[in-house]
């Protein structure tokens, strides 16, 4: 059982989406609506990733867009190591590996209206300039939003 399955506790919010068995399609984002309950608290936003032993790489490249309710958009290109140099997965689990990847730490969301988060895979095979049409082995992608302080600004 994956603990980040759409739970909501004090200061914590999370959700995830399952991906097709054929793999995560290139240019197909996983989209989430983030409801910020308190715009005065610093919060951290994590990307949650689950994959099986068939995931063929030791890292992953992601492109994210975070859309503010006022219409502004922040786009980031991210690179995460998923395995150590010896091939051991860095996440937790045995058959299914879960990673909690840092995305935005200690940030203030200045609106309680919904933010939109989109996550795309941007993985390429070695020597290829084109992204993989379908990224195998990734089972689900999600996010975790948690408060990092209990003191309002």
Tell me what each language-model feature is.
Residues 3-6:
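C-terminal motif of bacterial Sec signal peptides marking the signal peptidase cleavage site
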Residues 8-11:
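Bacterial signal peptide processing site
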Residues 15-37:
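Post-signal peptide N-terminal segment of mature Sec-exported envelope proteins
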Residues 30-49, 57-58:
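Contiguous beta-strand segments within globular domains
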Residues 39-47, 107-126:
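Noncatalytic modules at the cell exterior or secretory-pathway interfaces
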Residues 52-54, 98-109, 120-134:
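Short acidic/polar inter-strand loop motif in beta-rich domains
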Residues 62, 66-67, 125-153:
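Exposed low-complexity, polar/acidic, P/S/T/G-rich flexible segments that act as propeptides
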Residues 80-82, 90-107:
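A beta-strand/beta-hairpin structural motif
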């Amino acid at each position: 059982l994956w603990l980040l399955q759409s739970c909501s506790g004090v200061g914590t919010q999370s959700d995830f989406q399952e991906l097709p068995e054929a793999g995560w399609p290139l240019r197909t984002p996983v989209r989430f609506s983030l409801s910020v309950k308190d715009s005065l608290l610093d919060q951290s936003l994590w990307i949650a990733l689950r994959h099986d032993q068939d995931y063929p790489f030791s890292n992953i490249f992601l492109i994210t867009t975070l859309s503010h309710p006022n219409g502004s958009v922040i786009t980031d290109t991210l690179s995460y190591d998923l395995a150590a140099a010896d091939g051991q997965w860095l996440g937790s689990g045995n058959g299914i590996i879960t990673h909690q990847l840092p995305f935005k730490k200690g940030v203030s969301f200045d609106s309680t209206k919904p933010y939109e988060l989109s996550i795309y895979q941007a993985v390429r095979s070695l020597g290829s300039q084109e992204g993989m049409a379908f990224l195998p082995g990734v089972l689900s992608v999600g996010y975790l939003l948690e408060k990092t302080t209990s003191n309002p600004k």
